[in-house]
Amino acid sequence: MVATYFKEYDHDASLEDKSTEAYQKVWNAAKAELAIRAILKAKGAKGFTTNFDDLGDIEYNGFDQIPGLASQRLMAEGYGFGAEGDWKSAALYRTVWVMNQGLPKGCSFLEDYTLNFDGANSSILQSHMLEVCPLIAANKPRLEVHFLGIGIRKSQTARLVFTLSLIHISEPTRP
């Protein structure tokens, strides 16, 4: 799985150095992804949630970070996702993903951070600190390892980093 990450995503060559903490974070992210995939397959589930309040025990199961990379990759495959146990967002994401099949780009789990009610210039700034689907990236995602800007800051987290493509919500996107 780690080799797949390095093949599919741009990354700094130093991430491939197995002696570094950053490589260990990528390795642990891969273990988390494989575990989540196994659970989803065993249950026949098409969506899931995570919660950063309970990641397990690093000494017991090796989960030392939020499984953001797994969430990003699984969303790209159509699995519904909701953060902090939000099963309704997971169900909505899966529904929208299925409806979007055959159309360019995709959809993502995001949160409305700022609303600007300004008539014809109204806009919404949407973001999320980690679990954003790479299908809406403007360019090829980059695999990086960093501390989160908010929330859990005890451990660095592997994730895909990218700039979103701009979507004009005032213009129709369907024929």
Question: Could you say what each language-model-derived stretch is?
Answer:
Residues T50-D57, S108-L130:
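A glycine-rich phosphate-binding loop feature that marks nucleotide/adenosyl-phosphate handling sites
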Residues K46-G47, Y79, K105-S108:
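Structural motif
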